[in-house]
């Protein structure tokens, strides 16, 4: 079980494994992660402003051309789907481009997670880019956030796994541009199967639940992990690191 008050570092998508040491934090790796996070911040700002802007059409086209120029520079050296980013560390919990927590992801809020006793707590603010109904978040975004946090709770409890079932109940719309608070905790462990439950509220009113969810996660057998991840890199065949 994770220690109470353990803080998640930026870019960490799941709890570091107790049996595995975190990757060596050499200067070059720290610098690359910092640069990835800096680019991620800039891209998230661009995505948000692109969703909010009302500038004239000619300005939109100018910005589109500039964005394509930047994309060309980034595209000079890329990875494939079977190659992990050089800044990632599965055993240490670092997935820099994770869709929910990744500090390098243009699409992540990102969700910041910490361990608090037996529970895990996540905080984030959703901008206009996550809009579903006007002024409120898309329901799929709420499910995505809770799926990530429930999985983090499972890994923090020493039971990492992949999602096999997610049940979400929407009690009220989730407001945009409003600080949010999510909590999750493991409620049951049966063999390789783990059940976790969580809620989503605003930070200002944590007693009023907007969305609640229950997720079931299963730890992969070694042969399953090898089949799914064996072609990516050797330590990805370890079933203890096979999760989001």
Protein language model features and the residues they cover:
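Hydrophobic beta-strand-centered segment that forms part of the acyl-chain substrate-binding groove
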Residues: 5, 9, 23-30, 149-181
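Active-site helix/loop of acyl-thioester processing domains in fatty-acid/polyketide metabolism
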Residues: 119, 137-160
């Amino acid at each position: 079980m994770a220690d109470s008050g353990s803080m998640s570092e930026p870019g960490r998508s799941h709890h570091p494994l107790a049996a595995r040491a975190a990757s060596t934090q050499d200067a070059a790796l720290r610098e690359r992660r910092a640069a990835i996070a800096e680019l991620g911040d800039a891209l998230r700002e661009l995505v948000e402003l692109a969703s909010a802007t009302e500038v004239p059409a000619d300005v939109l086209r100018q910005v589109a051309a500039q964005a394509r120029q930047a994309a060309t520079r980034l595209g000079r050296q890329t990875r494939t789907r079977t190659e992990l980013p050089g800044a990632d560390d599965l055993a240490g919990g670092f997935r820099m481009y994770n869709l929910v927590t990744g500090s390098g992801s243009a699409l992540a809020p990102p969700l910041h997670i910490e361990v608090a006793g037996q529970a895990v707590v996540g905080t984030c603010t959703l901008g206009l880019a996550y809009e579903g109904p006007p002024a409120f978040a898309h329901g799929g975004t709420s499910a995505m956030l809770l799926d990530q946090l429930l999985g983090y709770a499972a890994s923090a409890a020493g039971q990492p796994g992949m999602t096999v079932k997610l049940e979400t109940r929407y009690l009220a719309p989730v407001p945009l541009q409003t600080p949010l608070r999510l909590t999750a905790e493991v409620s049951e462990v049966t063999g390789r199967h783990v059940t976790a439950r969580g809620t989503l509220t605003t930070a200002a009113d944590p007693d009023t639940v907007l969305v609640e969810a229950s997720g079931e996660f299963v730890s992969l057998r070694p042969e399953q992990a090898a089949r799914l991840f064996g072609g990516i890199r050797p330590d990805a065949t370890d079933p203890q690191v096979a999760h989001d």
